[in-house]
Amino acid sequence: MQIWVDADACPNVIKEVLFRAADRTQMQVTLVANQTIKVPPSRFISTLRVAAGFDVADNEIVRSVESGDLVITADIPLASEVIEKGGIALNPRGERYTPDTIRERLNMRDFMDTMRASGIQTGGPSTLNQRDRQQFANELDKWLQQVRKS
């Protein structure tokens, strides 16, 4: 099992948590992006650069992920495909996606798109804070412990 990261949009503070976890647990972490991603030297951390384009990184992650792998992403359609393949999807705020939360998020996204299309300014997500970072680290640790037990 390994960890895949939708790295183009993953906050640096979350990448740092993942880098430390990779070395601490000797778990392979692969960052997939359409640009060069700077990573610390480690035999447990790798990058996979894909061509620029819509969903190219997402498609590579879906192609590569195996049952039980963890994928870090804020992309709801990607999370849905990961779960369909038997993977685990976790967003950078520490929310573990389920089929129910994905359905809820897709409905909300569609609603917000409709609001924006009608001229209403909706704003974006709040800035990632220390509580979000801690929630992410806690959920990552839960997954790592489950992997060690299996």
UniProtKB/Swiss-Prot annotation:
InterPro entries per the record? UPF0178
Per the record, the domain of life is: Bacteria
Q: Which residues cross the membrane?
A: none
Q: Which CDD domains does the annotation name?
A: PIN_YqxD-like
Name the Pfam families on file: DUF188
- According to its UniProt record, which protein family does this protein belong to? Belongs to the UPF0178 family.
Query: What NCBIfam families has UniProt attached to this entry?
Result: PRK00124.1
Protein name per its UniProtKB record: UPF0178 protein ECA0873
